[in-house]
């Protein structure tokens, strides 16, 4: 029986993160400059407290358009209680979680602390490597 790799073997660990007190305008600029769709929000101990997504930032932008006020912090706009996956979860179970969810990536926790992030791409890559997917000619 082949052992299925774990999320920890394929997740990204070098993440952009925010704290709840980060100014929303600074966080938006970081997302734009890094060309990413969102980032985890952590407290001083590294515990995940939320996610700031482009959708959350659109709320701040609309607020600014209506009220001419770009004030606020990440805590004012972030999504709280995000869905997460455990770093010890195998890739098959992770794939099942992605199929049941609208999300393209999940924060990854170990003992309750943020240790990485895993995307659909990461899971697909890992499963492909595991079961020897046929190499496709990528020169289209």
Regions found by a protein language model. Give the residues of each.
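General secondary-structure edge motif
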Residues: 11, 25, 37, 57-58, ...
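The conserved cystathionine-beta-synthase
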Residues: 18-35, 42, 84-102, 109, ...
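Short charge-dense sequence patches
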Residues: 4-9, 23-28, 41-50, 76
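Tandem CBS (Bateman) regulatory domains
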Residues: 1-14, 53-84, 88-99, 114, ...
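A glycine-centered beta-loop-beta connector
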Residues: 31-34, 39-56, 98, 106-122
